[in-house]
């Protein structure tokens, strides 16, 4: 442990895709008081100096339960949801909520821990098509999807009626021996439907590609872990007492 002055804000764990490396934990005094208690910042960094996590904590000097285990993502305790220890991380970074971890794995599109690179057993379920239609992604993709749907609903009946009128006129011209006009109307019908089918195919393939990409990166992640990784409440109390004793020995400069 090392101590120094600092001014940091808590941040979410970043996505570290490099190889696993030894981590270094440092405790730094922030020089601020919360409810009359000093604060310190715990930083976890790799051996190459890359910052992995920063957590602002309050030094537990009055009550041993102020430093009970908390989720490393939302920094909340186990009052609303049980804490898990599903990977090989230890200490304050070893506990996490199931919902927080599932949301993180879904957002980052990964299946492993960013710190210890432990690979989780997960089940990925694709989200329904209706959800993509309601929220397809960025604003320009929403406008493109809405515009193509309006054009399709407007052009489809228009092209059908126009083609039927052209064919009907070509038949009438054939009855009156006006073959040139009949051939012109038939060619116009073929060109009209060719352009319509080409535009429909291109638009359909474009939106299918966007949907497949959205479906691949926006899956619902279900964490498959045994119940034994849950941290019981009595063990959480023991961890809190142990952390309080450990923090009382730390020197804040």
From Swiss-Prot:
Subunit structure and binding partners: Interacts with MARCHF2 and STX6.
Record PTM Phosphoserine, positions in chain: 237, 243
Matches recorded under Gene3D superfamilies: Zinc/RING finger domain, C3HC4 (zinc finger) (3.30.40.10)
Keyword flag Membrane: yes
Provenance organism: Bos taurus (Bovine)
Catalytic activity, as annotated: S-ubiquitinyl-[E2 ubiquitin-conjugating enzyme]-L-cysteine + [acceptor protein]-L-lysine = [E2 ubiquitin-conjugating enzyme]-L-cysteine + N(6)-ubiquitinyl-[acceptor protein]-L-lysine
Subcellular location: Cytoplasmic vesicle membrane; Early endosome membrane
Protein name, per record: E3 ubiquitin-protein ligase MARCHF3
InterPro entries: Znf_RING, Znf_RING-CH, Znf_RING/FYVE/PHD
Positions that bind Zn(2+) 2: 87, 89, 113, 116
Any one annotated GO CC term: endosome
GO term, biological process aspect, one: endocytosis
Transmembrane feature ranges: 145-165, 182-202
One Pfam family recorded for the sequence: RINGv
Lineage: Eukaryota, Metazoa, Chordata, Craniata, Vertebrata
Principal subcellular localisation of the protein: membrane
EC number annotated for this UniProt entry: 2.3.2.27
Database matches in PANTHER family: E3 UBIQUITIN-PROTEIN LIGASE MARCH 2/3 FAMILY MEMBER, E3 UBIQUITIN-PROTEIN LIGASE MARCHF3
Gene, per the UniProt record: MARCHF3
Membrane topology according to the record: Multi-pass membrane protein
EC category name: transferase
Zinc finger boundaries on the chain: RING-CH-type: 63-123
Ribosomal protein keyword on record: no
GO molecular function: ubiquitin-protein transferase activity; zinc ion binding
Residues reported in the UniProt entry to bind Zn(2+) 1: 71, 74, 97, 100
Domain notes: The RING-CH-type zinc finger domain is required for E3 ligase activity.
């Amino acid at each position: 442990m090392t101590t120094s002055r600092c001014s940091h804000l808590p941040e979410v764990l970043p996505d570290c895709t490099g190889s696993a490396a030894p981590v270094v934990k440092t405790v730094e005094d922030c020089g601020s008081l919360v409810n009359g208690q000093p604060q310190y910042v715990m930083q976890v960094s790799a051996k190459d100096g890359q910052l992995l996590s920063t957590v602002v904590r309050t030094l537990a000097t009055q009550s041993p339960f102020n430093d009970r285990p908390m989720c490393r993502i939302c920094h909340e305790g186990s009052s609303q949801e049980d804490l898990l220890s599903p990977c090989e991380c230890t200490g304050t970074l070893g506990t996490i909520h199931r919902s927080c971890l599932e949301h993180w794995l879904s957002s980052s599109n990964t299946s492993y821990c960013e710190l210890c690179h432990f690979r989780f057993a997960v089940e990925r379920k694709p989200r329904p098509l209706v959800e993509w239609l309601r929220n397809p992604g960025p604003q320009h993709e929403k406008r493109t999807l809405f515009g193509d749907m309006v054009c399709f609903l407007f052009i489809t009946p228009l092209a059908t009626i126009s083609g039927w009128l052209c064919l009907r006129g070509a038949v009438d011209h054939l009855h009156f021996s006006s073959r040139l006009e009949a051939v012109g109307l038939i060619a116009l019908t073929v060109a009209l439907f060719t352009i319509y089918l080409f535009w429909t195919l291109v638009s359909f393939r474009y939106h299918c590609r966007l949907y497949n990409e959205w479906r691949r990166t926006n899956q619902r992640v279900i964490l498959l872990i045994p119940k034994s990784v849950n941290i019981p409440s009595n063990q959480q109390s023991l961890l809190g007492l142990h952390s309080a004793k450990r923090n009382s020995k730390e020197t804040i400069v």
